[in-house]
């Protein structure tokens, strides 16, 4: 998961300069605490459904003004601070990109990524 590489690859695509005025990036990392109750987290186990992620991205790339979407997720046992999820939405104007980005993030997190947190005693 290399944010700079992904951005460079998007910029190199034919039509980029004709269709893109903004890119939004989400680089999710493992927290050292649980969102639910702020209990300490020493690691998490992550799995994802790549086919589902790809389908969501393809669906959302059909929206007005969206040029491309990239979604990558790490799997396995991860520690606090490790990269977990990388999302990039490239499109024409902020109104189109922001709305798509917000829904993309929510859908991928709820439909395609499964996380199990482990506390210090695990």
Go through each PLM region and give its residues.
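N-terminal, polar/charged subdomain of small-to-medium soluble alpha/beta proteins
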Residues: 1-84, 90-122
């Amino acid at each position: 998961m290399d944010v700079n590489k992904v951005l460079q690859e998007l910029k190199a695509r034919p039509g980029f300069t004709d269709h893109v005025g903004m890119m939004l990036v989400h680089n999710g990392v493992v927290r050292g605490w649980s969102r639910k109750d702020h209990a300490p987290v020493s690691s998490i186990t992550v799995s994802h459904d790549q086919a589902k992620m790809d389908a969501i991205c393809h669906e959302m790339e059909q929206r007005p003004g969206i040029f491309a979407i990239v979604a990558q997720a790490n799997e396995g046992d991860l520690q606090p601070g490790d990269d977990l999820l990388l999302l990039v939405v490239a499109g024409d104007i902020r109104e189109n990109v922001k709305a798509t980005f917000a829904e993309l993030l929510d859908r991928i997190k709820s439909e395609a990524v499964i996380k199990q947190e482990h506390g210090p005693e695990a």
